[in-house]
């Protein structure tokens, strides 16, 4: 529930907003063992937005969706820091069903972009403007790029202007690039991590 999520954001992260764990029991209490996956609150906030888009119910938007979306965005704001490169980077977190701690985790960066953009749209649709709106806009405009890695030549070979897969189920298929999305920067491992290994 939103009240429990607000309490947990304050208690666990010392921040405003709402935190919802990957595992939550039926009464709305979060499991504290999954507190490093930060994306569930964003996922739920986006469901609220989709419901509003489907129904165009302004009462639902102002009474239910916007409070939840705003609290999700407030929490997500605390997960990012603007570094010397001028970009907002995701602090320590984990990806889906994971335990490896990442900086600039793929899921956190993707959900940040979509959540902050959605929060700004929801506020506009409701005729509301919060003090945080400018911060969220700045984050969206200066968000760290998605984490990517270049694959080895044994996996993808450049052939003229295109690339072909050299192994796996789709061997021989043409692909756009020899770069793939990474999970993020492994804090302990000190390297970009992927679910793929050559």
Model-derived features with residue positions:
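Generic marker of "main functional regions" within proteins
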Residues: 4-5, 23, 71, 79, ...
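Short, charged low-complexity intrinsically disordered segments located at boundaries
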Residues: 6-29, 99-106, 142-155, 172
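Active-site core of glycosidic bond-cleaving carbohydrate-active enzymes
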Residues: 1, 33-55, 63, 106-113, ...
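Flexible glycine/proline-enriched surface loops and loop-helix/loop-strand junctions
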Residues: 28-30, 94-100, 179-183
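Acidic/histidine-rich catalytic neighborhood
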Residues: 71-126
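Helix-terminus loop motifs that line ligand-binding clefts
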Residues: 1-46, 52-55, 59-64, 68, ...
């Amino acid at each position: 529930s939103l009240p429990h999520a607000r309490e947990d954001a304050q208690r666990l992260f010392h921040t405003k907003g709402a935190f919802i764990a990957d595992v939550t029991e039926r009464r709305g209490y979060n499991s504290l063992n999954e507190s490093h996956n930060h994306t569930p609150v964003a996922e739920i906030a986006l469901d609220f937005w989709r419901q509003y888009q489907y129904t165009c119910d302004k009462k639902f938007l102002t009474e239910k969706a916007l409070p939840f979306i705003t609290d999700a965005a407030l929490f997500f704001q605390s997960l990012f820091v603007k570094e010397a490169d001028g970009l907002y980077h995701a602090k320590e977190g984990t990806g889906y069903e994971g335990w490896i701690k990442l900086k600039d985790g793929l899921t956190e960066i993707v959900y940040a972009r979509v959540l902050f953009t959605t929060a700004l749209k929801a506020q506009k649709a409701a005729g509301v403007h919060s003090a945080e709106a400018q911060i969220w806009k700045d984050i969206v405009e200066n968000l760290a790029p998605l984490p990517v890695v270049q694959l080895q030549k044994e996996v993808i070979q450049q052939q003229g202007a295109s690339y072909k897969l050299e192994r796996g189920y789709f061997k021989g298929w043409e692909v756009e690039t020899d770069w793939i999305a990474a999970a993020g920067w492994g804090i302990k491992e000190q390297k970009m991590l992927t679910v793929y290994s050559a």
